[in-house]
């Protein structure tokens, strides 16, 4: 495994730095930002972009990922989709897949940035790339490349009565002792509207301050 060069810098405002990173991502094919916001964690923020290598799979995915990691032994960013469960257990669900994403997608970034407190550290196989990209970040002005999204009308996939019925079934299972906690996700969609994902992420993150905020762009 090749070692990465590292260099650290100081920032004044993390939120402004996040906006610069999101603006920078417009010109990147592979980009991920993981933001802890104000929650205590090992890193306040992790970011990776560019691609040295990648893996995507919808069959025997975990074994392929394990082999990929053993080969690279480096930073890998990506996701495991909900339907990966169907590779582990014999499961059949009738959920409609409107996105058709692979069950697993990970990439090895050309450069990694992490933030802890007021210190930003860059990691790269090319020493000059860290300084060059840092200069690019500081040349980016707010909303330089991203534009505001138009107002989008969101629709629920299920009716209110269907939603209440599912919540009641979840409560029954909790009362029965099948589980003590359950995440219930539901679909909000818009069929014909276009949004600016960069501007939308910044606005949503500033509003929610989610402890597991993420922005991912692949290919």
Model features per residue range: what roles?
Residues 1-219:
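Extended alpha-helical targeting/anchoring segments
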